[in-house]
Amino acid sequence: MALGTYVPTAIRTSLLRKAAVVIVTIMLVLVGVGVFTTQAVSTQVTEQRDTELLTSTEQEAEALEEWIGRQRSATQYLSQDNAIQSAPQADKSEVLSTRISGLTETAAALHYVNLSTDTIRASTDAAVEGDTYTSYSIPWRGEGLSFYGGGDVITSSVFNYRGTPVMAFASKQPGSDNAVFVFHSVETRGEAFSRNIDGSYTQVVDIEGTVQIAADESAISSAYGAGRDAPVIATGLTTNSGIETRDGLLVGHAKVEGTDWVLLKHAPTSNAYALEGDVQRNIVVLIVTAVAGLGALVLVIGRDALTALTDMSDRAEAIAAGDIDTAIEETTRIDEVGDLRRSFRDIQEYLQTVAGQADALAEQDFDADALDKSVPGRLGESLETMHWDLETAIADLEDAQETAEQSRKEAEQSREEAEALAAALESQAQDIRETVEHAADGDLTQRLETDTDHESMAAIATALNSLLEELEGTIHRIQRFSKDVAESSDHITTSAEEVKRASGQVSESVQEMSADARQQNGIVQDVSDEMTDLSATIEEIASSSDEVAAKSNDAVSVGQSGRARSQDAIEEMNAVDEQAKRTIAEMEALDDEMTEIGEIVTLIDDIAEQTSMLALNASIEAARAGEAGEGFAVVADEIKSLSKETTEATQEIESLIADVQDSTTDAVTDMQEMGDRLSEGKSTVTDTVETIDTIVERIEEANGGVQTINTATDEQATTTEEVVTMVDEVGSISDDTTARAEDAAAAAEEQTASLTEVTNRIQDLSDQSTDLYELLSDFTVREDHAVADGGAENTTGAFVRSASTDHSRDATHHDT
């Protein structure tokens, strides 16, 4: 809300009243500022005077403290002066007079005193020589005149010395009973205090309330105020410094350090604050002068200006009411009022010219004299532009009417063409939508027509066809690959079963060998036991030798058969290992193919985003075309919907691919584990074969020994000792054979267990390959797709070329 709304109407309608209100307001502000300034100056002057007095008081107290210190030092120096000590008695007074001249002007007397007799032996005042100093009742401070060593200085309070108030400084000469007394005039010291304010004076008061130093002799030794109960004394001794006002006096107090004295500086408040009254009077005079000047300004200038402004206000109201011919008198005034009246006359002439030109333009009288006059400013430029525009518009109106019909016809033709274009785009968008829906349902055999008049739609169709071609080829390769994996897994399973059966046969053979070896060992032991009866049972030995020879031949045959079967098992394990390696490579290739499918789906997402941008561009074109672009708007909505559905379809495909990739990853992991187990089984079988070879060798050796025994049966009667030795050897070999046969049996059982685990892993791989093939069966592809042969041409970049190369490599591997 404007400030003027709070001003009464009677004031707002009169400039004189406004001026009066402003002047009164200014006067009130001046008075307020003056009062504030007076108070501020008064406070500032008061604080300044207080500060000056306090500073002076503190400085005087410090100076007095320094003066006392100097006098103590001087007294101590005099007590140690050899000239005074060594001077003859008759010359001591002269020496003292010489020394006192070097002291300050306050020094009133210098005495040389004998403390034993209390006698003044020499003095600068000859009248007191021979007197006792106790006759002056010197009020020594502290414990009296008691020296504790050379160099001590004792001071006194104020006392009267021959009519002069003084204070004494005393110091004892080292090694004697003599001392030096110096009397200082406190009146002279009081006259040294400054008097920077008229009527001011300074006094030094001790703790008892007695004036010790003052310029007024009558005040010295008198009680100050209420004596020791005076508040200013207590305050001065407890605080360092301060200012107080009492009895019309401004009193500054400061403690004299090292003493029990307070220095008090007094100044009459009327004199101390005299500057405050002068400043206040000057400010009042300034305010009165300013108010009087403002009043004179209103009377002299306001009345004349108000009359002229009232007249000009009436003329302005007439012009505002439309009376632009109202009389405005000329004036000879050269001030602002005269300039204002002349400006009003110029405005009147300006408005008259503008009105004449407006009338001529309204009547379309382009030859009127008023139009020849110049009208300055933007209004003149607008009138001139209006003149030429109106004249040109009238000339162009007929031409516009002729072209309007032609424009209408062209607009109708454009609308028909736009509708046809919208219909074509809508049809193509529907085809794209159906194709993408089929692809989302798994049918990858659908293709779009690329023969269209619209480059953008043709590019989209070409890109989508290329995408579907690559996706179909990839799915086809994965289907074939998963089928090959399943077939390879079945073949590996069959081979593993054969290996398992062979291993079982090997295990049985080894167990038979172990049983024969144990039986052979028992026979050999029996032979060894019966050797003591060999002479009586030679025929039984021969029979046993024949039986042992037969068993040994059987063991050799079984060992050779086991060796052959073990070699077959190794060859079969090698074949299984090679097949497992090929299967692992194929599963890893399948994992790479699934990664490529994921990248293709990403490409589909990019195309969907481009489709969204195409829909946005179509919407913009439709907005520009207005009603003729309604078809574009419909097509844009369809394309936008198609883009959204494509995105959803790619998300479903991504989910399906993720499941397939998980299955593929598990299959690859299982195959790798199976490969590790096959390697372990291969090592076990190799160890078993080596053990069997050793067993066969041992059996052949045992068989040779048995045949030797059988051949030498006829000679046993004569060579019993040789037979015993050979039987022992056969027994040792039989023990080794038995142990190795048992090891071979255990190894064969372990091999059988490993082959069982391998068979189970292969069966799991076959099941996972079957699941993968079933997942991929959701996609419909062409059996004769070119990509399956590794010869597909594509234009999607290095990624698709890499996929084709990998497929060709896989195809070559399978052909091999």
Curated annotation (Swiss-Prot):
Keyword Secreted on entry: no
Topology relative to the membrane: Multi-pass membrane protein
Ranges for region Disordered: 399-425, 790-816
Biased composition (Basic and acidic residues): 405-418, 804-816
UniProt PTM comment: Methylated by CheR.
Transmembrane parts of this sequence: 21-41, 282-302
Matching SMART domains: HAMP, MA
Record key words, sorted: Cell membrane, Chemotaxis, Membrane, Repeat, Transducer, Transmembrane, Transmembrane helix
Cited Gene3D superfamilies: 6.10.250.1910, 6.10.340.10, Methyl-accepting chemotaxis protein
One example GO MF annotation: transmembrane signaling receptor activity
Methyl-accepting transducer domain span: 495-731
BP GO terms, sorted: chemotaxis; signal transduction
Biased composition (Polar residues): 793-803
PROSITE patterns found in the cross-reference section: CHEMOTAXIS_TRANSDUC_2, HAMP
Name of the molecule in the record: Transducer protein Htr18
Species annotation: Halobacterium salinarum (strain ATCC 29341 / DSM 671 / R1)
